[in-house]
């Protein structure tokens, strides 16, 4: 099981890779630019090429990026949706330049326009983004959400519908354990059932990335708050079952736990202790 973490890039992309190596991780997730700002200076392509070479030499697989929190590809506001599409295309291009295998994105929010309208907007936005980056290889991974507010992507049927509408080999899925639990998928007492439901509505073949996070909130509470591994509502035994499940254990597991600057080593150790040979 490849284990990775979302690590800060405030000191540069190469510094994040060095930290991943010091933690004895197998893979890595990063932001390609600030996730809380629309604008960003152009990516230094020479620096990106150097990082890409170092990454390839490291033997780590995969490299995952996460896009901006501001992007809403499902927005009913045409101006905001266009701004989001443009920003998403920029994220895809940055991810490709850095050598990323996946770019994780949230499904967006319908903002009271209705789920079906939101899903249609999301699918159309993704089609445009993928068509305009058709010469690139990075895959876009739709992330399961906690279902807070009008956010799409909590029911598996949402993502299944979008996958069918977009019908692209470059569209993948990211399963976040905290989000799934908060959305009401009982991964504690019915993990096999949740996986079977996911397979029926989305398809396990489309699952590219796992986000491994414990949860601060209760099952079905729609609270998107991550907790340290084994210290939240999901707990160590359910985490053990997820990590070692025969249908999941081959996937890259990315930690997005709190206090990454000071507690990431603690969470890596907790996961390693739960892994079975």
Residue ranges with predicted function:
Residues 18-24, 44-64, 91-99, 127-135, ...:
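Acidic (Asp/Glu)-rich catalytic clusters
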Residues 39-47, 76-87, 113-124, 150-158, ...:
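Alpha-helix N-cap and loop-to-helix initiation/capping positions
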Residues 28, 123, 128-227:
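Acidic/histidine-rich catalytic cores of soluble enzymes
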Residues 261-277:
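C-terminal helical cap(s) of enzyme catalytic domains, especially alpha/beta-barrels
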Residues 56-57, 73-172:
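Active-site acidic/histidine proton-transfer and metal-coordination neighborhood
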